[in-house]
Amino acid sequence: MSDMRKKVTIPDILKMKQERRRITMMTAYDYPFARLVDSGGVDAILVGDSLGVVFSGHDNTLSVTMDEMIYHTRAVARAKPQAVLVTDMPFMSYQVSVEEACRNCGRMIQEGGAQAVKIEGGMNMSHVIRAVTSIDIPVMGHIGLTPQSIHRMGGYRVQGRKEQAERIMEDALAVQAAGAFSIVLEGIPSSLAASITAELSIPTIGIGAGPDCDGQVLVIHDILGLCEKYSPKFVKRYAELAPVITDAVNRYVEEVRSGAFPTEEHSFN
């Protein structure tokens, strides 16, 4: 599909909200998965700092570095996806100063090949988003459950219940006013996500935020059943590939040990 459809752009994403067409976003951290995800027809590919957990085996995203994000973004960009390519800005790459944030976001575009960056935070990061968008780098916001703030939040907990709801609505409005072209809503009640989506003119993309967002994002490894250690409530598994892969490796091991592989078919004369 990636060779037949036209390139998705930032204006296309904005137009999708206006036309009430649902936006689809999926993670990819490397070249092979980028090709597969793009062939599936998603509108946006996210090189998420979730790679720290999913790809590298850490307990959270806080150890992911700029160099790691650039490396993975370059790998995904080589797939030349028709989907718009968005990359997470990792922890401490944009919090220190506006100047450093702009420089690092510029690196992600220039060195990584991203077409947009994602920045976590609401009112507290609106000045950073405003500065980055002012130098023509598209920014996707991210509010609610922000994984880079897990220590303050006390872990991966649903946000926006009771008195928190008003603050998260204010965060959403601040991110929009700062110039973001879209915003991820993570781990918030579906009723709050619906209210934010109705209030904003920019698209909302939900993950654990219910069905009323303008779009949805999930981690590719989660939907394929490759992350066996955990399965959040908001994840739907569309395949169970872990046992398929394990079985293939087991059969390879057995055939090598028994002498059944390689055969003449797999040998050179």
Swiss-Prot record:
One of its GO terms (molecular function) is magnesium ion binding. Mg(2+) binds at residues 49, 88, 120. GO terms for biological process: pantothenate biosynthetic process. 3-methyl-2-oxobutanoate binds at residues 49-50, 88, 118. It is found in: Cytoplasm. Keywords: Cytoplasm, Magnesium, Metal-binding, Pantothenate biosynthesis, Transferase. Binds 1 Mg(2+) ion per subunit. Pathway: Cofactor biosynthesis; (R)-pantothenate biosynthesis; (R)-pantoate from 3-methyl-2-oxobutanoate: step 1/2. Its main location: cytoplasm. GO terms for cellular component: cytoplasm. Its EC number is 2.1.2.11. Disulfide bonds: none annotated. The active site is at 186 (proton acceptor). InterPro entries: Pantoate_hydroxy_MeTrfase, Pyrv/PenolPyrv_kinase-like_dom, Pyrv_kinase-like_dom_sf. It comes from the Bacteria. SUPFAM superfamilies: Phosphoenolpyruvate/pyruvate domain (SSF51621). It catalyses: 3-methyl-2-oxobutanoate + (6R)-5,10-methylene-5,6,7,8-tetrahydrofolate + H2O = 2-dehydropantoate + (6S)-5,6,7,8-tetrahydrofolate. Catalyzes the reversible reaction in which hydroxymethyl group from 5,10-methylenetetrahydrofolate is transferred onto alpha-ketoisovalerate to form ketopantoate. Homodecamer; pentamer of dimers. Belongs to the PanB family. This is 3-methyl-2-oxobutanoate hydroxymethyltransferase.
